[in-house]
Amino acid sequence: MPKISIILPTFNVEKYIARAIESCINQTFKDIEIIVVDDCGSDKSIDIAKEYAKKDERIKIIHNEKNLGLLRARYEGVKAANSLYIMFLDPDDYLELNACEECVRILNTEKESDFIWFDFIYKRISGVINRGNFLQDQTFTIFEYCENIIIQNKNICYWNLCSKLIKTEIYLASFSFLEKEILNTRLIMAEDALIYFFIILNCGKITTSAKNIYYYCENDNSSVGTNDIVKI
């Protein structure tokens, strides 16, 4: 059983997906699986993923019958995961090559953590890179996390699910709080915010890390703007 599953919900990202997959297959920690979710785009994204899958058995491709949107595409990917922990990677972003190694290092120290939030790097279209420096190495109970992060740090977009490691069973359990009608609705914004709070409520311990492991890349098709991510 792999330790970590990296989920890539994929829709019309042929310009970027090779970079994202390369950042997964070249992780310094090798005991992972990479799940590419085909959300029925019209470009060659999945063809590119299939070429990588031919060369690396850790890559699994699953196909949605129709376009479900980000929330459901991620959910379908997690249902197919075989690991104890999952991480989301939007295919127009990419990971530091030691991202999974850092996850495992923290898990070995904070064995009861259900959720780990890492700082990340914002890469602008111009090439300018801003490194986040708003998190410290800390572990919280759910009550401490709500008080110290959600209430006191209102300038931080804490509800984005990128740059986070989540225990698989907690993510799946969080969907039991959603009405079936919501789950079957194709949302076009705030998908992360919808499920984030249910995830947090299911956690026992939450860890934050000052390590930058995730490159959030600005592009013309980015679904979230700079100010929605974090004030850097």
What are these regions (language model features)?
Residues 98-134:
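Conserved donor NDP-sugar-binding/catalytic core segment of glycosyltransferases
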Residues 1-25:
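N-proximal low-complexity "stem/linker" segments adjacent to membrane-targeting elements
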Residues 64-81:
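Glycine-rich, basic loop-to-helix element that forms the pyrophosphate-binding segment
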Residues 38-47, 66:
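A conserved acidic beta->alpha catalytic loop
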Residues 18, 43-52, 94, 98:
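Acidic helix N-cap motif at the loop->helix transition within catalytic regions
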Residues 86:
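Short aromatic/hydrophobic "clamp" motif used to bind/position activated sugar donors
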Residues 2-4, 25-36, 44, 56-60:
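Short loop->beta transition adjacent to catalytic acidic/histidine clusters or analogous donor-positioning motifs
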Residues 144-229:
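Conserved nucleotide-sugar donor-binding catalytic segment
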